[in-house]
Structure formats: structure tokens, C-alpha cells
Amino acid sequence: MNKTISTLLGVGFLLVSLVGCAPSEKPPDPNEQYEKIPSYKHTVEFLGENTFPIGAWMAPPYDNEVTPIPENYISEQAFKDIADSGINMIYALYDRCDNTTTMQDSRNINVMNSLRYAEKYKVAYFARDWNEMALMEEEDTAEMRKIYDEFDKIPSFSGILVQDEPGLVHFDNLSAMKKNFDKYFPQKTFYTNMMPTYATDNQLNQGAATGGGSPSTIELYQKYVKDFISKVKPQMFSYDFYPMMNEFPNIEKGYFENISIVASETAKAKIPFWTFIQATSWGGNVRICTQAEIDWQVNTSLAYGAKGIQYFSYWTPYDDSGTHPGYYPNRTDEQIGSMVSHDGKKQDMYYRVQNTNRNLTEAGEILLNCGFAGIIQHGESPDEIPEKDLLTDFRQLKGVSGVDALIGCFDKDGKTVLYVVNNSIVKEGEVSLQFEKNVKASIVQDGKTGSQEGETVKLKLKAGEGALICL
């Protein structure tokens, strides 16, 4: 049974305004302090310690012999577009480097060009190596370093994308690779993205690319997360769960359970977690997301304590010919819905993500340094939230009324921080927060800052929208 906090009646609406104290009310105490809650983050060196990581897969590609893409899309404009969308990290795929050749190789020249453009527009760049297994042996690592040392002369070089969705069988090798990488590049990120709970048992054991198998168990998934953290010792845990499947407004079950498992295990290990946002479609059941669906994914992740947000995908993948969108037989770019088409044109999804990132950039800077305490649920939820994560109240907050909502509860240096989310992808509405006494609230909503003062704070939230409250 879900715990919910008491429903309170309220009238009127106030989005972000300043309300004076009635003569009988006690003024807010600006020095009120609570016990501090630990906070964990991974700093991407190029971005700085107070910039919230906002990543995307994949970077603008170049023409190459493996995937015969007809043009080189690495350009200054392409990286300006990345930055203008609010994304500050980009992961390579087709634009791979090659440590078995020299810096004069066209592949490495293309990566260097990407790094220079990324530096100009303040985008952290994660390289993808053709031969990352060279990190297994010290003598091979020495050869790899010749290339990486050149990359490292450009500040935007932020690490390497090692493997996407590995299985349990890969963890020992990944551990050895990370140890070698960390010897020489301790300030860079050894990046690996992990699978969701709906991966099959065979995929969790052997890696996503193997396919097949039976539905996995939660116990196996917990082992998968724990073993990766204990063996590989990542700087953060990145994973994906794509919930917008089948017909709108269905949301795939298990979304919050997956976040809960990852949040719990990373907190034990004292590392942060990053998560991917579904920003494309594929197959016959994964749909193109609306603005509300993008907002809901990002904002529920923030409410659960995510310290990094990533989008799949920025550039549309290719088919084997390199001339058409990949993975999606007989579909156009518009029917796929990534941020940028396979030939470099901005699509509707680009502007949806850009809209979401306005608030994410501002609120994320504060949440990055906040310790997560739990979730308050008001009303119904499209997916069940694990009982162990639910709070009935938090510090000064004693009641909630209005539309279905989630309130992520945080601490920042002994002060209360709340992240309020409209927990619907269909309807907008008002959420009222009732406090035990008069409070002065600083509010970040839609990238803008305002304030309210009183025993009640009221927010009007679009479907899926989130707002940050600092007391």
C-alpha cells in the first residue's frame, strides 16, 4: 500500500510570487538547520564541479569504411547546435579514434577536430576507441597512451566510452581496463552504460548484444548492479530504462523500481547515478515522446536523486549502407524522432529537449550538491513506487494537495530542498504544499527564479513539469 500524505484543501492560484506574512504569523527562520544528508556526484573535469552533466548519445559522425556514411558531419555548426540544445556532454560512436595508427590517420584527425569544436562550445567529449581492449595489457596501454596524450592536450577530452550494456561476464575485463586507464588519466571518465531491469537473463549475463533468453528476475538485476559497482568501481553508474512503450499514455511498469535499485546501490557505494532519457523511437512499440513525456522522464529522475541526465539519441543512427536511418526499416527520420536526423537536420525532438534543458540546467546546478532523503507521493502514480522509498512528510513539509505529484526530498548543507513533479503526462494542474510554519521559498521553474513566502506554496505545473523549492 502506498503511503500518501494528508490532502489539504486550498483555493486560489499563485505561480511564483512573493506573499507577505500575516501579523500573527511567525517570520521564517533563515538560520534553521537540519541534520545533513550525504551527497555524491561525479565531476566531469572540463565542465567543472558545479555544472550538472547533461549528455547525449551520439556525436556528429564522419565518413568511414565500417559504416559508409557519405559525408563528414563534424563541423563547428554541429557542435554549436549541441551546445544550443543545452547538452554539455556528447558520446562518440561512428567518430571512433584508432590507437593502432598515428595521429595523421584520418580517423584520429576527425576526433581531434571534434575535440576542438567541443572545446569552443563548452561540450565535454567522450572518445570511442576502435581497440579499447588494449587497456587490458600494460604494453598495449603504452601504445594507446600515445593517442590519448594528444587528445588530452585539448581540455574537452573528458574520457572514453568503453562499452554499452555489458553483461556479468565482462566485469572482470572491465575492471582490469579501468585500473590501467586510471593510472594515466585519473581525472577522466571511464564510461560504461548499463542495462535496465527488463533486460533478459541472457543479456544480463552475456551482454545486451547477445539477445535471447527469458525474463530476468529482480534478484539477478540486483546482482548485476552490485557486481558491476564492486568489481569495476565506476566513478558513477549510468543506465537506461525506456518507459514510453506502445500507445500513449502507457508507461512501462518497473520504471520506479529500476531507479530505486540503482539509487539504493549507488548510495551504498557513495557514487552518483546518471540515467538515459528516451528521445527517439524504434521497433514497433517504442514511441516518439511528447514534450510532457520528455519532461516527466527528466523530472522524475531528478526527484529520485539522479546527478546526470543523458538523451538517446542525439544523432540518428545509420543502417549498414550509411545512407539511411538505422535499426528502423522503411522509416523516415521524422518517423523515428531523434534530436537530429541522419543527415544533420534538427527535428522536433531537438526543441523538446532544449525546452526541458532550460529548467534542468538551473535546477540541476542546485540538486547536484543535494543529498537524497526519499519521495513523497500525492495521489495516483502511473507506475508503483517502492514502499521503502516513500515518506509521509519531510521536515517542514506536512501536507500536499492538488494534482498527482511526486516530491523529491533533499538536504543541502542542513537546509531543505524539494523537487516537485506533476506525476502525469496527460494533465496540467496546481500543487499546493502546506508547511508546519511560515517559510520563505526560492523557486526555480521553467529556468526562471522566483519566491513565495507563507505557510503554503502553490505551483501550477504543466504535464510532467518539475519545479525546485529551496527553503
Feature map (PLM): residue ranges:
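C-terminal motif of bacterial Sec signal peptides marking the signal peptidase cleavage site
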Residues: 19-20
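Bacterial N-terminal signal peptides that target proteins for export
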Residues: 1-9
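Glycan-processing catalytic domains of CAZymes
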Residues: 27-438, 445-471
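Short, conserved catalytic or interaction motifs in soluble domains
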Residues: 23
